[in-house]
Regions:
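Secreted/periplasmic carbohydrate-active enzymes, especially glycoside hydrolases
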Residues: 2-169
Length: 169
């Protein structure tokens, strides 16, 4: 076998691309090893100072088309007056050529929010898009207003992927 990557931080999500190691039409085997060393445990709180051991979360293997988005995240930033916001969206892509990303923002009521700009060309590598949102409904424990951000990836005018994220301002 071939070592692909190492990840430190057992409680953080991570992904890795195994495409270069897959042999189409042949038997492929993926092995995941967990090392939980007692001498590598933080004693920050003095509580629960013991090895955890094993895989505690789901492990998912998924296939993506060559033109795709990964490491997607969305952040909301409110202005100093706590009135208007900017929705900052980041992601990466291994390939770009002729692809674009389109966004739809749906209010908690189900009404589509009118975005000033909703389509962006997909660039190879890291991408960052900013969507200004005027006076969005705010999220708090008593008013859990969540918007739905729909992300659509298209290439040469044809939709090749779509997913949603729930967003609070």
């Amino acid at each position: 076998g071939t070592f692909v990557r190492e990840h430190h931080g057992g409680f953080t999500r991570w992904e890795t691309d195994v495409t270069p190691f897959v042999r189409p039409g042949k038997k492929n085997e993926i092995r995941l090893e967990v090392t939980d060393r007692l001498d590598d445990i933080s004693y920050a709180s003095g509580y629960a100072h013991h090895p955890i051991g094993g895989i505690l979360r789901d492990v998912t293997l998924f296939a993506l088309p060559e033109t795709c988005l990964y490491d997607f995240y969305a952040e909301t930033h409110l202005d100093a007056a706590y009135e208007d916001a900017v929705l900052k969206i980041g992601y990466s892509s291994p390939v770009a050529g002729g692809a674009e990303v389109a966004y739809t923002l749906t209010e908690p009521s189900g009404r589509r929010y009118p975005l000033v700009q909703s389509r962006f060309p997909l660039e190879e590598g890291g991408n960052m898009n900013e969507l200004p949102v005027k006076n969005p409904l705010k999220w708090d424990a008593e008013h859990p207003n969540l918007y739905t951000l729909t992300i659509t990836l298209s290439k040469d005018g044809k939709e090749i992927g779509r997913f949603d994220r729930r967003i609070g301002f």
